[in-house]
């Protein structure tokens, strides 16, 4: 019988952190408490992975890098959402996203650079 070269030789207890879409990832559960620093690149408007990681490791330091998310982005994103919300009574979620961003990144040891 041939040996299956794709079979796993050990078991890893994986956990999904973040959303079920692009913002979430599978990682070994055992490394969460061992991690001191989390570097995140390409944050966008979904920091659910970082938020979930921080919830499981309160001492974690997080540095996020994304050149597309800046003051101008939030200004335009929020103003446009407010305008369309007033006009059409929708896009309220975009406004809430801004406030969630401010709340998460105002925590100690959490930076968006």
Features from the language model and the residues they span:
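Rossmann-like AdoMet
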Residues: 1-21
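SAM cofactor-binding core of SAM-dependent methyltransferases
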Residues: 14-113
